[in-house]
């Protein structure tokens, strides 16, 4: 009898454990569906906004434009930026599709990752200045500016670009973002660190999931598809490496990933 009770007790625990696990999986799927719907809504907005602007500028110019040629040129420049924005969204969607279908291919070459980071920082300097955020690089802890790695330059450039761009988007007035390099013998550790608004601890485990948004109030004025960090994670992992995040709300965030040194 005691043995039967033990078996029944064990079976009951197993069933309860299975029920709890199933409940967690269902909740996870529900949240994913919620995030997916929100993503599609955001995507529609992110595409419509620049397209309507482009259409407005082009119609004005087709009707003869304005007398001031400087304004006409400004219209063309804004339309060009709108096209770049739409192109960026389409490229993100194409990339995440390739990742999910395991069709992502790397074109690996020898890359000086410090020089690559400098290029990315310089390309985002004007945006950072508009938000009164300073950008800097610290390679001294790695011992050299000549840090060669074998990687896909465009893909790692996208990783750095996304991380630095996010740091600017969620930075604070008179804030600072720094890209740091550390020598780990066989690997190089790269950090993108800021003193911005930070992230609540409860959000960190899901931060790299597709469609996941930390807080609507945070992202309302930033835009984007919500795929950026998911893409970053996949691109780093495609190089056989890992990415991590440390963050404290109100104190800033540090994203770090490794690359194999040559």
Predicted regions, residues:
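Short acidic helix/loop segment immediately C-terminal to the autophosphorylated histidine
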Residues: 62-70
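Short alpha-helical segment of the dimerization/phosphotransfer core of two-component systems
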Residues: 81-89
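Conserved micro-motifs of the catalytic ATP-binding
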Residues: 101-106, 144-151
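Short helix-loop "hinge" at the ATP-lid/N-box region of the Bergerat-fold HATPase_c
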Residues: 167-168
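Short beta-strand/loop element within the Bergerat-fold HATPase_c
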Residues: 174-186
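Short conserved segment of the HATPase_c
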Residues: 199-213, 233
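Conserved glycine-rich
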Residues: 240-241
């Amino acid at each position: 009898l005691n043995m039967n009770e033990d078996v029944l007790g064990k079976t009951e625990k197993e069933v309860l454990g299975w029920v709890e696990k199933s409940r967690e999986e269902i909740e996870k799927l529900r949240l994913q569906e919620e995030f997916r719907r929100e993503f599609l809504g955001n995507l529609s907005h992110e595409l419509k906004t620049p397209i309507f602007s482009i259409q407005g500028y082009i119609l004005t110019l087709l009707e003869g434009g304005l007398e001031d040629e400087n304004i006409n040129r400004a219209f063309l420049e804004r339309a060009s930026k709108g096209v770049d924005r739409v192109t960026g969204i389409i490229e993100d969607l194409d990339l995440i599709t390739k990742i999910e279908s395991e069709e992502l291919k790397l074109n690996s070459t020898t890359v000086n990752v410090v020089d690559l980071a400098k290029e990315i920082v310089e390309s985002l300097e004007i945006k950072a200045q508009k938000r009164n955020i300073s950008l800097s690089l610290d390679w001294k802890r790695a011992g050299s500016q000549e840090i060669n790695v074998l990687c896909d330059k465009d893909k790692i450039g996208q990783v750095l670009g996304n991380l630095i761009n996010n740091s600017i988007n969620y930075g604070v007035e008179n804030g600072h973002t720094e890209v740091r390099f550390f020598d780990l013998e066989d690997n190089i550790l790269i950090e993108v660190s800021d003193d911005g608004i930070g992230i609540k601890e409860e959000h960190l485990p899901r931060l790299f999931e597709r469609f996941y948004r930390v807080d609507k109030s945070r992202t309302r004025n930033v835009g984007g598809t919500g795929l950026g960090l998911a893409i970053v994670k996949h691109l780093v992992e495609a190089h056989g490496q890992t990415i991590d995040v440390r963050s404290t709300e109100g104190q800033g965030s540090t994203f770090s990933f490794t690359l194999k040194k040559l």
